[in-house]
Structure formats: C-alpha cells, structure tokens
Amino acid sequence: MQSNSTGYKLIKIGSIVLILYVLIGGLFLPLKTGITGVSNGQLKSNEPQSFSVDLYNPGSGFVAEKVILKHKNLVFQSQENQYNEVGYLNSKINVVLGDTQHSQLFDVFVFGSSSVSPKQWMYFPDAVWVEKSISDTGVSNKIELSNLTSLVKQDVQSGFPNRPILNESIRNLLYHVPMWFSMMFLLLLSVIYAIKYLMKNQLKDDLWSESFIKIAILNGILGCVTGSSWASITWESWWPSDDPKLNGVAIGMFMYLAYLILRTSLKDPYQRARISSVYAILIYPIFMALIAIMPKLSADTLHPGSGGTVGFNKYDLDNTLRLFFYPAVIGWILFFTWISILRYRFETIKNIQIEREDNE
C-alpha cells in the first residue's frame, strides 16, 4: 500500500465526502412519527374501554384514522379516536376475543395523516394486555390482516424510522456500528501485513500491521464510548455486565492492549516484528469469535441480531436509513484507513530521522 498513490487520494477524498454526507443527513433528517408509550394498557374483552397512546413528532393537524391492536392473526380496530395537540391519542375499543381465544398481549398500530405526511403509521410492541372476561363468548370481532398490510404499504412519510425505546437515538447507528466494522477491517489488514512480514521479513510490513492495530484500538474505544452512551438511553445502563458481546469486546480490547505492551518489551526490531506478527495473527480469529460468534450462541445478549434478538436489518433498517447507514460504514472505514496511512507515514519519517541521528 503506497501512501502517495492515487488510491490514497481516493481514500482521503472518498472518506471526507461520505462522512460529510452522513453527518449532514444524520443530524438534520427528521425522525418519523412514533409512539413513546401506552397508558391504561390493561383491558377486559367484550367491554368498551379506552387506552391512551403517547405520540412523538406526529406533525401539526394530526388526525388518527385507525388505531389497531394486533397479536399474530388477531387484529382489532378502535371505534373512536381523539387526539390533542399535547401529543396524546385517546382510543376507545371493544375487543371480543371469542370462545376460541385466550387473554393476549397486543401490539398497537396507529395510522393517520398530518401536515408532515398524508399517510403515516407507527407502532409499539407488547403495549396492551387484553384479559378475557367471562362474558366473552361467541364470535370474535377481529378484522382481516390484509387490511393492516395494505395500510402499512401506504406510508409515504420521509425520515428515519422511529422505533420504540430507540427514538432519536437511532441516529447513533450511523456512528456506533461503523466503528466496529472499521475496527474489524483494520485488524484484518493488520493480519495480512503480519503474514507479509513473516514471508518477506521486511520491517515496513510490521510497521503497517502495527499502524492498523493502533488505529483499530482507537476504533474500539470510540465504539465503546458511542455504545455506552446509547446503552444508557436504551438499556438504562452504561455497561450491562451480563451482555456477552460487551464482555467479548472488553476481553478483545485487553488482548490488543497486550499486543502494545508486548511490542514495548522487545528491543530488537526483527524479534519484535516476528513475535508481534505471530501474536496478531493468532488473536484475530479469537477476537472475531468473541464479538461475532459467541453472542449468537447466547440467549441473553441485548444486542440486535444475536441470541434471538431481532436484528436491525429486519426491524429498523428501512430504505431511508439504508441511504445513510451503508455510506457511513464505507466512509468511516475509509477514514480510519486514511488515518492509519498517515500514522505509517509519520512513523516512517520518524525512523528515518532516528537513523540519520545515529549515523551522525
């Protein structure tokens, strides 16, 4: 990898353009309408009752067209909806489960229109518990599921998806996740150059490997900072100690910090390069197993996409967010690759100066 090549310039320019695009869009694109909570969410079947939905960013002049409770194929629609400008939607509904159903926990869907969008929808999972009453017998008053599906497809509101618990913090997806992609990419490059050193015995390859690892550690620190701030909002804990992915990250970070300590303890440059290269090659698959494989085998992780937890690609990553998420991943990878190249150049110049001073 030549630092003065056309590829270097493309990496530098590409990273700046993509990150600026992500920063501007990620900060200023509004969030879609969402639900932040549901009050009076315990109902009895076959009895007209009301519950309240707390809406976020619905837009002025919002009108609730439909409020729906859904559990698998059971779908019920409210009979009356009243919205006030404070952000609360009061819905009256009479759920008749019928003689073939039991008490169930329902998701809430709200469909409406406002000055923001003529068609918009939002939902909140596991929001309303319907207790089956003794008088609930006979035929259920559920509606067809196809009605709900067609309404969801009519959503034309622009903006980032507004998901329960995440809300505005979903923007952190453009920073937190790319940090770990960047770290894994740089660590892979460090392994490649470690192998090159063992094959060719050239110190420049060891310097490349060291540069990639040091910037990857910076990625890990930034990933922990952005992740902890996110966790404090969504999980109400800066570092949930029982999450296997977080524990795997902590172990992996200490493994690479040990790499730096190992290098400082070895004075001979060729011995340092040889031992460090072997160490870098050995710990990379262990690190990947700790952060990518072990969490998927655990049932207790809080991170999306692991241990049965729904992943962003199935739950939150809609088309609007994809337009920024994928450029964010590429942009941050290019940016930290550029920083790694700059560090390599700095260390190369410093080594040349040291050699000149020794010769004098």
Where are these regions (language model features)?
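Polytopic transmembrane helical bundles with strong interfacial aromatic enrichment
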Residues: 2-41, 82-86, 122-360
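Immunoglobulin-like IPT/TIG beta-sandwich domains and homologous Ig-like subdomains
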Residues: 45-114
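Extracytoplasmic/lumenal ectodomains and periplasmic regions of secretory and membrane proteins
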Residues: 98-140
